Amino acid sequence: MKQYNVGVIGATGMVGQRFITLLENHPWFNLVALAASTRSAGKTYEEAVGSRWLMKTPMPESVKKMVVLDAANVEEVAAKVDFVFCAVNMKKDEIKALEEAYAKAECPVVSNNSAHRFTPDVPMVVPEINADHIDIIPAQRKRLGTKRGFVAVKSNCSLQSYVPALHPLRKYGISDVLVCTYQAISGAGKTFETFPDILDNVIPYIGGEEEKSEQEPLKLWGHIEGDKIVLAESPRFTAQCLRVPVSDGHMGAVFVRFENKPSKEEILQAWKEFHGPAQDLELPSAPKQFLHYFEENDRPQPKLDRMLENGMAVSIGRLREDNQYDYKFVCLSHNTLRGAAGGAVLLAELLAAKGYFN
């Protein structure tokens, strides 16, 4: 595989830091540019971050002395890289404009942000589930007037446990899904030190999260029609999202109803056999086994299972029949790896393998 020079926009934030750790020894991607807000620009990365390095591993030596660029200087950043990862903390309209500015500068954008998730010609991709949605990129390039530039996004972190678990069961006609998510504090960019309110507490509201959790699966399961991605019409989703005192790892308690109810054995077999393009293409960040089922009654657990396959696999447990829905189960994914930076790196690997950065 060809080597690509990459940049991280929003490099000083928690997800930006996670990108940096994931790209440190990446076999395809060479990190050459870091960009952030005007207040960080011109400083070395070490100076810009200061005491706010939030990863459990040390800051890579390779980035400490790298001078942070101003993310608003699109042409300067774009000239240094083949594409960028974007994880910025700005208003949605500002993010949309910034990402399209990079795309129009012929610099593809792989985004962790939510701003473009429902732009009709922007693919929102989980590589194991809807890799074919990247086929919309030529239509997006036509709209933007670009030869090379485009925006591709990953879906919300809350979905990354339950949508993969449901996906191989769609052949049985999923009609209704009720999901309650229990979401780690790193999803809010926080640690226990910076979020004292969460200690000995559960916060029963995460702004915008329930809408994303109900609506985004329908885009993942949609299809390309002309110059847009048309949303799937089913299943019906309802969600509740809670912030819980866990550092990393989002859990979902899922209740599902089918048009053609499978047996428990058929569900377990579907999970065991499931693989997608990420596995078939042997992408560097892809888990060997995407879905792991635990027979133990007390699994999965964030502390024990979130790092399964380098934090890129989904853990499932407690599958049983339900007296109102057909089945219920619990699932878990690492929200800043599979659910954020890791999922975006995997998407970039898919785009690279399919030639979209050439």
Model-found features: residue ranges?
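Charged docking surfaces used in two-component/phosphorelay signaling
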Residues: 186-358
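N-terminal Rossmann-like NAD(P) cofactor-binding subdomain of oxidoreductases
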Residues: 1-204, 235-236, 308, 314-315, ...
